């Protein structure tokens, strides 16, 4: 990416398209370059309003030692569909595939759930499993989860807040307040049959955990660090999403897969690590 940006400043969408990766994966790598002071992002006017354009900070660099470090650093990625949960405590649950709606209330583990590209519920808790084999004999530098989500109301309600909490291996990380159940404008990925009166899109949220703490969309929100998560215990990493029963805004939630909303991705785990 550095060489590409050095040749020509680009937006996140342009970088992702050029490298055939998702926007969230591109953003993960761009954030690493920004943290190192190698590139910077500036808001500039474009055809569809302002967008962040990434520029190289220096005209020339020597990377002899950096190349050694970069060769040792590895990236692990895994996507899990919104219906591929391992645990679910949901009183009411619905999912939509690319073709139709399925009601999963009282049958949460029906095979229909694997068709899900959108899940909405009246609250409760849902947990997803990710491979943790990369954590064995490794030093983990950062692990992040990104997903598109919003609140859940009848049809849609743009001002319906919901406090949505995230945990890893049952260790609470942080709570994100969704500002609404968004509709009125069709989602970029909404299937043709999906009614205009329904929820259309969410917000892309990224939760990152490092040795310095937990970050929500790049802002530090918790002192919980990697060592608190026991990532190498058992055979999986359990990522949980839920409304606390005593939440100030118990606004339920929608989880978007790669065929609904505005972001073509499922629930994505990205980890940065080095082998021992």
Where are these regions (language model features)?
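Amphipathic alpha-helical dimerization/coiled-coil segments
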Residues: 61-117
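Short coil-to-beta strand junction motifs in C2/discoidin
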Residues: 156-168
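A short, conserved structural fragment
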Residues: 36-44
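Short beta-strands within extracellular/lumenal beta-sheet-rich domains
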Residues: 117-139, 221-225
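A short beta-strand element within beta-rich, extracytoplasmic domains
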Residues: 139-158
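Extended, solvent-exposed segments with strong compositional bias
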Residues: 107-119, 177-233, 249-251
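Alpha-helical residues within the helix-turn-helix
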Residues: 17, 34-35
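Short, cationic-aromatic polyanion-contact patches
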Residues: 11, 44-67
């Amino acid at each position: 990416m550095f060489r590409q940006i050095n040749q020509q400043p680009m937006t996140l969408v342009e970088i992702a398209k050029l490298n055939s990766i998702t926007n969230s994966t591109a953003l993960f790598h761009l954030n690493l370059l920004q943290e190192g002071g190698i590139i910077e992002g500036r808001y500039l006017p474009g055809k569809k309003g302002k967008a962040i354009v990434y520029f190289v900070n220096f005209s020339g660099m020597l990377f002899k030692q950096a190349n050694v470090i970069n060769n040792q650093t590895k990236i692990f990625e895994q996507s899990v569909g919104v219906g591929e949960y391992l645990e679910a405590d949901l009183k009411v649950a619905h999912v939509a595939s690319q073709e139709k709606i399925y009601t999963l209330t009282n049958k949460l583990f029906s095979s229909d759930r694997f068709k899900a590209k959108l899940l909405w519920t009246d609250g409760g808790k849902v947990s997803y499993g990710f491979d943790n084999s990369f954590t064995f004999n490794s030093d983990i530098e950062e692990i992040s989860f990104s997903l598109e989500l919003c609140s859940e109301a009848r049809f849609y309600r743009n001002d319906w807040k919901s406090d949505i909490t995230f945990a890893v291996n049952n260790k609470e990380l942080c709570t994100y307040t969704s500002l609404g159940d968004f509709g009125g404008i069709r989602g970029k990925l909404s299937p043709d049959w999906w009614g205009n009166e329904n929820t259309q899109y969410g917000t892309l949220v990224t939760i990152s955990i490092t040795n310095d703490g937990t970050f929500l969309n790049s802002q530090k929100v918790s002192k919980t660090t990697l060592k608190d998560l026991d990532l190498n215990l058992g055979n999986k990493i359990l990522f949980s999403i839920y409304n606390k029963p005593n939440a100030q805004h118990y606004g339920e939630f929608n989880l978007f897969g790669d065929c609904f909303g505005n972001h073509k991705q499922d629930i994505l785990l990205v980890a940065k690590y080095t082998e021992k």
